[in-house]
Structures are given as C-alpha cells and as structure tokens.
C-alpha cells in the first residue's frame, strides 16, 4: 500500500518576485544549482508559459537512494503559481506559490505525494521520520542554493513539525532501515535461487 506524505516548504528571499520566478519556472536548469536534482529531461514541451510541459526528474538525496518521476505542469499564473502532477516513484501534486511583501519574495511549495517504491512503503512505519527529514534536507539545500544564485539572502526556513530530527535518530533509523532492506533482499534472493 502506498504511503502518503504532505510537505510544506517556505522560503523567504530579499529578491524581486520576477527573479525568483524565472529560476523556479526553468526546472530544466535545476541540476545546475540544486545539488540534489540529478537530472531533468524534457519529454514534451509546454506552451510559451511552460503549461503542459512534461519532464522526467531524478532526485538524489542525503540518504543512499534516488527517486524518479514524470512531472507535468498543469497550471501557470506568472509570476505567482505553478502546479503540476507527478507520476512514477512518487505520485501526487506539487504547487509553487510566490508572493511579495515589500522587498521580500515568499515561496511556498506544497508537495502531496505517495510513494510507489515497495521498500519505502514497507519501511514507512519505522522510517517515515527519516524520509521526512531527508525531504527537508533537500528543500533546505534548494533554498540556500537559490539564494546564492539570486545573490540574495534566504531569510529563514520555517520548520515543519517533522523538521529538526536529531542526527543520532537519523543515523539509528537509517541503520535499522538498511538492515531491514538487506535482510529482505537476502530472503528474496534466497527464495529466487530455489
């Protein structure tokens, strides 16, 4: 059974909204500045506003796994909103919302997805906090890198309820998850060789 996740990321930059928009809308360039975006491959072009575009995106992570999915842009309201759907190892919706308060641009990203990787779903009851921590690491790094690209300051990253997991818990959880996956693979391989 797929495990559902809902994430909210908020970035605040001392930069103009149009400059922030121009970087976010061009996801094909994300691998140039966002450490955890391994590749973005255009499958279908969109219109002049990128509406309808389809891309295959592969993410690396702070943990030893990758996730890939196709992402289609379903709604664009320049420079305020980009919505899309994901299909693949993650399935669901994502929404970038940009707003401006004085000289500050606020970026909110809502990511509501379920996982289709069986090992992730199997381990979710014990590893969910680790997966959530990993997501936050990816997004925090994205915010910092975007600020550098903008020559701006990332003013803060408000923390989600699952955000600041102590490092020891992450290490213990990752070790436990790795041991479980290793054991599962051993059993599967052993059964397959009979």
What is each PLM-predicted segment?
Residues 21, 30-34, 59, 96, ...:
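Signature tryptophan residues that serve as conserved aromatic anchors
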């Amino acid at each position: 059974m797929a495990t559902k996740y809902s994430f909210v990321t908020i970035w605040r930059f001392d930069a103009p909204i149009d400059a922030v928009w121009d970087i976010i809308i061009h996801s094909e360039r994300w691998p140039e500045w966002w450490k955890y975006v391994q590749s973005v491959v255009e499958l279908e072009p969109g219109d002049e506003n990128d509406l309808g575009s389809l891309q295959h995106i592969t993410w690396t992570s702070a943990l030893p796994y990758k996730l890939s999915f196709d992402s289609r842009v379903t709604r664009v309201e320049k420079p305020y909103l980009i919505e899309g759907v994901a299909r693949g190892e993650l399935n669901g919706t994502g929404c970038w919302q940009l707003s401006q308060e004085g000289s500050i641009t606020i970026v909110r990203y809502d990511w509501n997805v379920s996982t289709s990787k069986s090992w992730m779903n199997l381990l979710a009851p014990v590893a969910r906090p680790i997966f959530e921590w990993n997501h936050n690491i990816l997004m925090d790094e994205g915010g910092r890198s975007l600020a550098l690209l903008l020559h701006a300051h990332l003013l803060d990253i408000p923390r989600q309820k699952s955000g600041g997991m102590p490092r020891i818990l992450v290490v213990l959880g990752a070790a436990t998850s790795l041991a479980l996956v290793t054991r599962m693979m051993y059993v599967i391989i052993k059964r397959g060789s009979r």
